[in-house]
Amino acid sequence: MAASKTQGAVARMQEDRDGSCSTVGGVGYGDSKDCILEPLSLPESPGGTTTLEGSPSVPCIFCEEHFPVAEQDKLLKHMIIEHKIVIADVKLVADFQRYILYWRKRFTEQPITDFCSVIRINSTAPFEEQENYFLLCDVLPEDRILREELQKQRLREILEQQQQERNDTNFHGVCMFCNEEFLGNRSVILNHMAREHAFNIGLPDNIVNCNEFLCTLQKKLDNLQCLYCEKTFRDKNTLKDHMRKKQHRKINPKNREYDRFYVINYLELGKSWEEVQLEDDRELLDHQEDDWSDWEEHPASAVCLFCEKQAETIEKLYVHMEDAHEFDLLKIKSELGLNFYQQVKLVNFIRRQVHQCRCYGCHVKFKSKADLRTHMEETKHTSLLPDRKTWDQLEYYFPTYENDTLLCTLSDSESDLTAQEQNENVPIISEDTSKLYALKQSSILNQLLL
């Protein structure tokens, strides 16, 4: 049964030795020493996984060859070429070093055929050209138990590391957005970034190896790389505007690079967090008959400052406010020279006044928003902004509505202004020619020319 299940994995491992190219997993090679055995992956250091002390390398199962722990693929290549043994699903082995050491000992106690499925290559060729390959996989109960025990051991190490971080009060970190320093527990800086910068990477109790996680994110920002789409930008301001406008101030849950920092990915052998969560939902979905196949997520819409009108793009919203309410936010921004933070204050100020049914032009309070809107349209008070000191206050840094999409689309980029508008703001200082004649008469050049 084991041989029939896995025969395809190595069936094309070697062809006739008449000079033809051999293949492993569909990849061809001419020289068996230079073959690529399987899709390669860069070495990873799973959080919390420790190696045996005094053993920085991993030995071959059969001989005395040793390879560094980080060069796992070279060892696999050596074993399949020199010893004709293939280990199935290596990526599901939680601790590769302990796994190899275990089987190295077992193969000295019993023949390899007691543990491995034997697959004969070129069975139709002459007997002297046939070769046997050995497949070690979890079909063997002993191998399955070993893999599960290694997984449990890694989970215990991860939970111990997590508990240590939860109890650690000597944490020191710097916010990657405002450079504020934090001392004490890791939860302080994580809660700060979630609360003050809307950057939520998860609950502190769900994260492990927090220092390494934060260093990984900080390195991306230092390289001017977006944390979500991982595009690189020319400067920090461009990156900041991109992450704010595109709402990319978050990490991509589909990026496997971050999986090792979440405890959920260590819970079950060979299962990602998505598969674990899907299993939890299946019990609920089994009792539901609703068809969600035609459900589509609608993009977040920006809401008008004065009425309930919503628009899918900010450009349409600007046109609506100008046509329906004679309020031109872009013109106000240009005339008053508002930067991003001042625009935020102004929008939050107007939102609060409209919410309180108060006209900010004449300070009259109305019974309903409809009455306020009628009054402001008739008196044209929508464009009658109060003095800057009225709305340019610290209290208006805080949004009136938590889901105000309009705030995410504001920009202080100079590219929003036309070339003419930019030139109008540049002062031109004329040259002082009042003393030009006297300067000419006293010049030393006159003496040289005489």
Swiss-Prot record:
Record bears the keyword Transmembrane helix: no
Zinc fingers, C2H2-type class: 224-248, 355-381
Annotated Gene3D superfamilies: Classic Zinc Finger
Alphabetized GO MF terms: RNA polymerase II cis-regulatory region sequence-specific DNA binding; zinc ion binding
UniProt keyword annotation of Methyltransferase present: no
Annotated PROSITE patterns: ZINC_FINGER_C2H2_1, ZINC_FINGER_C2H2_2
GO biological process: one example: cellular response to hydrogen peroxide
Subcellular location: Nucleus
Disulfide feature: none
Induction: Down-regulated by oxidative stress.
Name the UniProt record assigns to this protein: Zinc finger protein 277
Lineage, top ranks: Eukaryota, Metazoa, Chordata, Craniata, Vertebrata
